[in-house]
Amino acid sequence: MNQQYPSMLLEKAVGEFAKLPGVGRKTAMRLVLHLLRQDTAVVEAFGNAMITLKHEVKYCKVCHNISDTETCRICSNPARDASTICVVESIRDVMAVEATQQYRGLYHVLGGVISPMDGIGPSDLQIESLVERVKGGEVKEVILALSSTMEGDTTNFYISRKLDGMDVKLSVIARGISIGDELEYTDEVTLGRSIINRTLFTGTA
């Protein structure tokens, strides 16, 4: 046992929290000690919520967003514009775009971007299901809203080639987002403007 910790149980709990992205051991220690001070019912509710989420959460069969049902609330909402699809990397990006209140279409979550260095290729992403949605004929515009990174640009280009020849407008969010920035960390105003001011994708955006 690390002599820094008075308890092996505490050390183990801190170690588990420290596995979370963006959580160092100091932050993990604060979180664990905070939970330790709470009533047992509070801690059990926290744990049960995580277990229930893991076992019962679903992924939308249409867009791959997280959902409580087979089809997410966005895809099943008749008030949304089904002729427009905003392509994003992750579920967090859907939440970021929704927070802008500037977009009323549907989404398509790829589950990542093409990154050979990380061993992620096109077949590891939800690209073919996007192509199938466009082939359905109802989609008139696909908005590429991936991060302004080399991997994001590579994925944009690949998608553009897959959709080449189809009767669909392909656009990309405006570059109000700095190069290298990830969508989820962009402020709502900037992201909203980037969507509104989107431009046609030329392969060099």
UniProtKB/Swiss-Prot annotation:
Pfam families: RecR_C, RecR_HhH, RecR_ZnF, Toprim_4. One of its GO terms (molecular function) is DNA binding. Gene3D superfamilies: 3.30.60.80, 3.40.1360.10, 6.10.250.240, RecR Domain 1. One of its GO terms (biological process) is DNA recombination. InterPro entries: DNA_Rcmb_RecR (IPR000093), Rcmb_RecR (IPR023627), Rcmb_RecR_Znf (IPR015967), TOPRIM_dom (IPR006171), TOPRIM_RecR (IPR034137). SMART domains: TOPRIM. Residues 83-178 form the Toprim domain. The keyword Lipid metabolism does not apply. The keyword DNA damage applies. A zinc finger (C4-type) spans 60-75. May play a role in DNA repair. It seems to be involved in an RecBC-independent recombinational process of DNA repair. It may act with RecF and RecO. Belongs to the RecR family. HAMAP family: RecR. This is Recombination protein RecR. It comes from Phocaeicola vulgatus (strain ATCC 8482 / DSM 1447 / JCM 5826 / CCUG 4940 / NBRC 14291 / NCTC 11154) (Bacteroides vulgatus).
